[in-house]
Design a protein with these regions (language model features):
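A contiguous pocket-lining binding segment that forms or flanks enzyme active sites
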Residues: 91-108, 405
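Long, contiguous binding/interaction regions
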Residues: 2-69, 108-176
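Short, well-structured hydrophobic secondary-structure segments
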Residues: 40-98, 217, 221-243
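Catalytic cofactor-binding cores of redox enzymes
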Residues: 120-123, 129-138, 144, 266-294, ...
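Long, hydrophobic/aromatic-enriched structural stretches that serve as scaffold segments
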Residues: 233-291
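Generic non-transmembrane alpha-helical segments
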Residues: 67, 71, 105-108, 112, ...
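Short, conserved charged micro-motifs
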Residues: 53-54, 99-106, 298-301
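Phosphate-rich cofactor/ligand-interacting catalytic cores and adjacent structured alpha/beta frameworks
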Residues: 170-244, 251, 289-446
Length: 446
């Protein structure tokens, strides 16, 4: 996201700001004179410039407002007034508590919250006089730009408006990006854990056995899942931070991050491939989520996210096209060994810098399947917006959950639905297309 796009909205005039200030003063005295409180808290955001309200500012105001409504309860809230207007959002809390402990508590928020430097949390006694930090023998607030005394920097105009606004935009951007990235990573790893925990699963690792995988077990998957958490976050941040770039550029960034994620996975599993395909799919999905979320607030439009998945996923098809052209030049004797084991990552090869070779060791499982049978596999799924998950797996899962089945049983039956209807390159890799077709037919009758 371009930081210059953060603070955009309707500018207000100095006359409008003065009128808004006068209204707040009247409201302050109205609440203080009501006679049922001991002090008054005023909450607003410290936004420099003529634009006082924009999406991140309003989201931050509402987020902190919810926290204050909960945490100020210990001080006995007697009245609350909330106002959202173009001159700046603000709220009043009339409390039945001495002002000093309230001020101490609010200073801790200003000092510890990621956006605390942008919070104005003022406390007034019944005489209308605000409690100052120096009254509590505390240091003054620090400058948003240089970390010095904020009052001194303001009085001496040490920093330009542009620099102050840039730093403000960065604080907002980093806060909401990091929080959203954490949510995306949490959802991704939760999906991994749900998948491996679903029991029973034909031929796959679950809580009871390792299926057809003699080199791994349930705990191998847990180790792998834990190692990938920071990379799900990284995929999201790459999409968010570079949302203004072309999809091809974002994909190259995701490719490199995905290869590093696979290295982390192999390190955690001692060289065992547990989640290569999922790393590719998660890079596309989390990257798409980050790119879309950079310009929109929650809830994100699902179709827009899937559309971005299609764009990013389509970038990987170029590798298969280059591979196909290269394979056409090979002699008939240069065949692909479908039984060779791949020890590399499954993020698509950088064919620009590493042209595909005929040797099996240079190809991933997906590339060998494509070379032998023309099946696009995970790349094709991503380029189409993950239709197997969206149109087959998710509806099946919702159907069985709505019918009253447990999450475990609904997930197991959704898996059988996927096996019976979707093409699985792992089954093709292990037994060839005929056995994969037979397995699909068998799954339909389970």
């Amino acid at each position: 996201m371009n930081l210059t796009d953060v603070i955009t909205g309707t500018p207000v005039t100095s006359e409008e700001l003065r009128a808004a200030r006068d209204r707040r003063i009247l409201k302050k005295w109205e609440l203080l004179s009501a006679g049922d409180g001991s002090c008054l808290v005023e909450f607003s955001l410290n936004i420099a410039g003529a634009v006082k309200v924009f999406p991140f500012a309003r989201a931050a105001f509402r987020e902190e407002l919810r926290e204050l409504q909960e945490k100020l309860g210990r001080f006995s809230i007697k009245n609350t007034k909330i106002c959202e207007e173009p001159t700046g959002d603000h709220a009043f809390f009339l409390l039945d508590s001495p002002e000093i402990p309230v001020k101490q508590f609010l200073v801790s928020i200003e000092e510890s919250h990621p956006l605390g430097r942008l919070f104005n949390l003022d406390v007034y006694g019944l005489d209308g006089v605000s409690v100052k930090r120096q009254d509590l023998h505390l240091l003054p607030r620090t400058c948003l730009v240089c970390g010095g005394d904020a009052n001194t920097c303001l009085a001496q105009k040490r920093h330009s408006m542009e620099l102050i606004q840039w730093q403000t935009a960065k604080l907002f951007n980093d806060h909401f990006r990091d929080r959203s990235a954490d949510l995306a990573a949490s959802a991704a790893v939760r999906g991994q854990l749900y998948e491996v925990s679903t029991t029973p699963k034909p031929g796959l690792v679950d809580r009871n056995n390792s299926g057809s995988h003699s080199d791994m077990d349930f705990f191998t998957f847990l180790d792998s899942s834990a190692s990938l958490i920071p990379w799900f976050r990284e995929f999201f941040c790459l999409g968010w931070d570079h949302a203004d770039e072309a999809d091809e550029q974002i994909f190259e960034r995701l490719r490199y991050a995905g290869q590093r994620a696979e290295t982390a996975m192999f390190s955690a599993t001692h060289g065992i491939n547990t989640h290569k395909g999922l790393v590719f799919a998660s890079a596309i999905l989390c990257g798409a989520l980050g790119k879309v979320h950079a310009g929109k607030s929650l809830p994100l439009p699902a179709e827009e996210v899937l559309s971005e998945c299609r764009k990013l996923g389509s970038c990987s098809l170029g590798d298969l096209a280059k591979l196909s052209r290269h394979q056409n030049k090979l002699s008939p004797a240069s065949s692909i060994d479908m039984n060779s084991q791949d020890s590399r990552g499954s993020m698509p090869m950088d064919t620009k810098n590493h042209p595909p070779q005929a040797e099996p060791s240079a190809l991933s499982n997906g590339e060998r399947i494509f070379s032998a049978y023309g099946i696009q596999g995970a790349r094709g799924e991503a380029a189409a917006g993950f239709p197997s998950a969206v149109r087959i797996g998710l509806p099946a899962l919702k159907k069985w959950l709505a019918a009253g089945f447990s999450l475990n049983d609904a997930a197991a039956m959704a898996l059988l639905t996927l096996i019976s209807e979707a093409d699985d390159t792992n089954m093709v890799h292990r037994g060839g297309p005929e056995l994969a077709k037979k397995s699909k037919e068998q799954a339909k009758h389970l």
